[in-house]
A protein has these predicted regions:
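Cytoplasmic helix-loop-helix junction between adjacent transmembrane helices
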Residues: 133, 139-177
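Juxtamembrane intracellular "pre-TM" segments in multi-pass secondary transporters
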Residues: 2-13, 230-273
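Central cavity-lining transmembrane alpha-helices of secondary-active solute carriers
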Residues: 65-82
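Glycine-rich segments within core transmembrane alpha-helices of 12-TM secondary carriers
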Residues: 168-194
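C-terminal ends and interior cores of transmembrane alpha-helices
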Residues: 98-128
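Extracytoplasmic
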Residues: 18-49, 57
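Symmetry-related core transmembrane helices of the 12-TM Major Facilitator Superfamily/SLC fold
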Residues: 201-222
Length: 274
């Protein structure tokens, strides 16, 4: 049995740390995009004629809050967890990264497009936004769905590769690299924008390029993930492989069923935690 276990790919220190840094880099680019607009408010407030976007503080506040709109009101994190359990790491990760890239494309169009001073208005609630803010908010909301689902996917990936190894250290390094993305956005976004003539879109475009690289990196990871599954299957045999799915495979033995919702919502502990 020891000889078989040594053939599992996650037992290779180089392989599991490579897998970690690949997915951690993807999350780092996501965190960079999340906060890249935060230091740019001084440019957003400028009139359009002066190279800004003409946003007010209220406009920026709505944009910043849009990150969680779809996640909260459409319960996308909840459904994202279900998708992860049902469809597995590779499918969910690629889907999440794809949503992030699409969202940032829309966000970039929102802050660089010429909307001619048009506004998005909902008269029945007396709500109005510059069209640039509305489009950017839509993109940021879509990005937020992908980023949060990617986060829970990365957590499952780390558990899959590092169970029985340096699990806590791996999680700590992943969080540290993610915060490095936040620090890069906070410290570098405004100087980068000023280097390109005060254009708000410049750091967003930089983030988009980094995110695409992160997406491609995750695709590379899926190859490693498939090899890990194959190595586990070969080492354990088909019968034992089925028993290890919960921690070493993307398909958990404890698959989610919609009937489980009854037990979740009827559990007082669930509502206390909420």
């Amino acid at each position: 049995m020891t000889e078989k276990l040594q053939r599992i790919l996650s037992d290779s220190k180089g392989a599991r740390w490579t897998a970690l840094f690949i997915v951690a880099f993807t999350m780092m680019t996501g965190y960079f995009i999340t906060d890249v607009m935060s230091p740019l408010e001084v440019l957003l407030d400028k009139p359009i004629a002066d190279g800004g976007l003409g946003w007010t503080s209220d406009d920026y506040g709505f944009f910043a809050g849009s990150y969680g709109l779809i996640n909260v009101f459409l319960l996308m994190l909840f459904f994202g967890g279900i998708i992860l359990d049902k469809m597995g790491i590779r499918f969910t990760g690629i889907m999440a990264c794809g949503l992030m890239v699409i969202g940032v494309f829309i966000k970039y169009y929102g802050v660089t497009g010429d909307f001619g001073g048009s506004r998005f208005t909902l008269s029945f609630v007396n709500f109005s936004l510059p069209m640039s803010a509305a489009v950017a908010s839509l993109g940021f909301a879509i990005f937020g769905v992908g980023c949060e689902i990617c986060g829970i996917t990365v957590s499952k990936i780390i558990t899959k590769w590092f169970t029985g190894h340096e699990l806590a250290l791996a999680m700590g390094i992943q969080v540290a690299l993610a915060r490095l993305g936040t620090a890069g956005a906070m410290m570098g976004a405004l100087p980068f924008a000023k280097a390109f003539g005060g254009k708000v879109g410049a750091p967003v475009l930089l983030g988009l390029v980094l995110l695409v690289i992160g997406f491609l990196s995750f695709i590379v990871y899926t190859v490693m993930d498939k090899k890990l599954d194959k190595s586990v299957e070969e080492a354990k045999g088909e019968k034992e492989f089925e028993k290890e799915k919960e921690t070493l495979d993307e398909e958990s033995d404890d698959d989610f069923h919609f009937r489980d919702l009854k037990y979740i919502f009827s559990n007082p502990g669930f509502w206390c935690i909420c």
